[in-house]
């Protein structure tokens, strides 16, 4: 079977990976080069349980599948090492935000029907056993089964892997239209057995309710800081997160901003993020700002992914801020669907028939 994939972000690359390993002949199209999409602007926080604060159990299930079954297997195929750690994550709050702290845990427990088996409330002693430098915090929520991944290195390594197995990569080629079995560019019309649309915000003709949610990310180099796990600092207006990387690098950002805006990071966001991270750890006072990144994540009206299907066409979109968390499991789900004539689906709630 021949597959044409439009869109070479994380969803498109993982789908190319899955289809090739299932015996398909794959071609991959992208409107830009390999380093210019929202997948390269992510921090790589894999948090299926703490995301229950605002998401649903289906997203958590996809994320658990990705962390447990998918990511270790995918990384094992890649030509170079990719930083992936399942060492858990921490959720902290400012003493003045205790109400948000309580609401956060209640929202998660309500999703779990009060059956809490996914996080622990740590004492000060237990917290500094995990992270000795978080001395100012008296308590934290600890999610032991969460993880984080270096998504920038991952994207590069996936591209090298796809190149090494001979998958054609047609870059800097905007896809003008998609039909069942057909991808049209300015230069040529391409025919396939199945076309997979992974274009994100470029697929608004197929997903009319698609919009962009802005994400802003600051890279810091902080030799005076030794933190080992992702940290989320609760705030009533936004959720700050910090994700560590090797070499004393730290990525900090705000989870979401309701604006389809690709402009550079604002002064307000910069001040808020840097103030918050300095409150988290005074060692960030001498950190160096390496770069600032913004992009918009494709989001549907209900903040959930959707898979539209027809004979010769599958379109997946709306991964929102959960791209690296759910894309591996979604790729496996799409492969199950297309190879079983949509009879053997683990997540039928995300599927709907597409009529052009």
Language model: regions and residue ranges:
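Beta1/beta-strand and adjacent pyrophosphate-binding region of the FAD-binding site
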Residues: 1-9
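Active-site substrate-recognition segment that forms the wall
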Residues: 11-18, 22, 45, 80-84, ...
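Glycine-rich FAD pyrophosphate-binding loop
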Residues: 20-40
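Dinucleotide-binding Rossmann-like beta1-alpha1 core, especially the glycine-rich loop
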Residues: 44-126, 130
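Short beta-strand to alpha-helix junction loop
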Residues: 54, 58-64, 94-100, 141-157, ...
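Helical element adjacent to the flavin cofactor pocket in flavoenzyme catalytic cores
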Residues: 140-178, 190, 194, 198
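C-terminal catalytic lobe of FAD-dependent flavoproteins
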Residues: 287-356
């Amino acid at each position: 079977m021949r597959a044409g994939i439009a869109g070479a972000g994380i969803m498109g690359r993982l789908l190319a990976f899955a289809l090739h390993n299932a015996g398909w002949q794959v071609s991959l199209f992208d409107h830009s080069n390999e380093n210019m999409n929202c997948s390269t602007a992510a921090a790589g926080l894999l948090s299926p349980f703490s995301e229950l604060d605002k998401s649903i159990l289906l997203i958590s299930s996809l994320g658990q599948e990705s962390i447990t079954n998918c990511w270790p297997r995918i990384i094992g195929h890649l030509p170079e090492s990719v930083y992936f750690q399942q060492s858990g994550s921490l959720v902290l709050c400012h003493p003045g935000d205790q109400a948000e702290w309580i609401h956060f845990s209640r929202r998660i427990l309500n999703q779990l029907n009060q059956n809490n088996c996914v996080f622990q409330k740590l004492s000060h002693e237990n917290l500094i056993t995990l992270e000795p430098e978080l001395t100012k915090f008296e308590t934290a929520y600890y999610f032991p089964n969460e993880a984080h991944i270096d998504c920038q290195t991952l994207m590069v390594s996936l591209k090298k892997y796809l190149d090494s197995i001979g998958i054609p990569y047609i870059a800097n080629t905007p896809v003008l239209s998609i039909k069942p079995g057909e991808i049209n560019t300015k230069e040529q019309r391409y025919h396939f057995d199945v076309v997979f649309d992974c274009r994100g915000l470029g697929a608004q003709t197929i997903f009319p309710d698609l919009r962009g949610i802005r994400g802003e990310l600051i890279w810091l180099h902080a030799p005076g800081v030794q933190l080992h796990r992702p940290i989320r600092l609760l705030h009533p207006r936004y959720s700050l997160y910090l994700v560590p990387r090797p070499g004393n690098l730290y990525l900090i950002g705000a989870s979401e901003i309701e604006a389809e805006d690709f402009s550079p990071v604002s002064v307000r966001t910069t001040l808020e993020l840097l103030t918050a991270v300095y409150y988290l750890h005074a060692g960030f006072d001498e950190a160096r700002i390496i770069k600032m990144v913004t992009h918009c994540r494709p989001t549907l009206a209900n903040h959930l992914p959707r898979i539209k299907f027809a004979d010769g066409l599958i379109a997946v979109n709306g991964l929102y801020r959960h791209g690296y968390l759910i894309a591996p499991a979604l790729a496996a789900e799409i492969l199950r669907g297309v190879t079983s004539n949509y009879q053997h689906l683990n997540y039928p709630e995300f599927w709907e028939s597409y009529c052009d």
